Structures are given as C-alpha cells and as structure tokens.
Design a protein with these regions (language model features):
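Conserved internal helical-beta-strand scaffold that buttresses enzyme catalytic cores
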Residues: 1-69, 75-101, 110-116, 132
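A short beta-strand-to-alpha-helix junction
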Residues: 117-121
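Structural signature of the thiamine diphosphate
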Residues: 146-167
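An acidic- and aromatic-residue-enriched active-site/binding cleft used to recognize and process polar
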Residues: 73-75, 105-108, 141-142
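Conserved beta-strand scaffold positions in the cores of enzyme catalytic domains, especially
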Residues: 102, 136-138, 166
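Conserved thiamine diphosphate
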Residues: 123-150
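Hydrophobic/aromatic ligand-binding patch that stacks against planar heteroaromatic rings
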Residues: 92, 128, 157
C-alpha cells in the first residue's frame, strides 16, 4: 500500500531508456533514448547499430530519416576507447549511418583526474574526433540561444555532408 504501480525506481532515469512519438510542425517524430547503464560510453555502438538497423528496415538508403545523436561527458569522450572504436568504424560500409551528431557536455565529473595534466594528452576532449576529420563547434552551455544555434548548424551539416559533427 502507498506504492505507485509501474513507477520507475533508481536514481538515474536514463538507465531505463525512453521512447515516444512527438507531434511537431513537420509531422510526427519518433524519439528513442536507449537504456544506458553507468558505464558511460558503452551505449555508443548500441545506438549506432540500432540506427543502422532502423535505416535498413525502412529502406533509408540516403540515411536521412533516422539520425543518431549521442550525448557524452568530456572526460569519457576522450578517455574511453569505445568512443575511438565507434568513430573509427563510422565511415565503413557496414556501420555507416550518414553521420552522428555528438553533443559533449563538460560535466566536470572526470572525478578520477583531479589534475588537468592527468586527464588527457590533447588540448580539447574533442581532439579525438580529428581521426575522422569531424568538425567541432565549441559553444558556451550557459548561453542557451547559442546552444540552439550550434545544434541547428550541426543538423544542417549532417544533412548536407552525411558525416559526424561534434558540439
């Protein structure tokens, strides 16, 4: 008694995933957030594989109808090998999805590295995206209008060039 039936439990809701159809001025859009345990970037190849499967299933040969968006923390983007593996495979025939939009948040919780000189060997966490020549847009997350502008630029870039881009 006193419990909500079907209520989600746990402290991090994105662990459970989410899926919904949203009405937009351009029509209905399906949005899916894959379940993601606290193993940070391990969801990246899962999302990319899911997108590729959906594209193949609906005959989306130009890779424009299903678009992967990955959210990253700054320390995990530059520090976890699964990111580099996903980037490396992104341009191959079997794994190509027409480009992924990567959004990196400097969440300042790369807590195992208190000294910036222990965090990485590059100036920016986004430098690993140079391996596929992905453009990088740096934006101040405290300026919501500029963040929206950066997302618009990234979306247009992905639509025109069918390649990864990083914000």
């Amino acid at each position: 008694e006193g419990e909500l039936e079907g209520a989600n439990t746990g402290d991090v809701k994105y662990h459970l995933g989410f899926s919904s159809n949203l009405d937009t001025p351009g029509g209905e859009v399906h949005v899916s957030l894959n379940s993601n345990p606290s193993h940070l970037e391990i969801v990246d190849p899962v999302v990319i594989g899911s997108v590729r499967a959906r594209q193949d299933r609906i005959g989306d040969e130009d890779r424009s109808k299903v678009i992967p968006v990955l959210l990253h923390g700054d320390a995990s983007f530059s520090g976890q090998g699964v990111v580099m593996e996903s980037l490396q495979m992104s341009q191959t025939r079997g794994f190509y999805v027409g480009g992924t939009i990567h959004i990196i948040v400097n969440n300042q919780i790369g807590f195992t590295t208190s000294n910036k000189y222990d965090a990485r060997s590059t100036d920016y966490c986004t430098d690993v995206a140079k391996m596929i020549q992905a453009p990088v847009i740096h934006v101040n997350g405290d300026d919501p209008e500029m963040v929206v502008n950066a997302v618009k630029i990234a979306t247009k870039y992905r639509a025109k060039f069918n390649k990864d881009i990083v914000i």
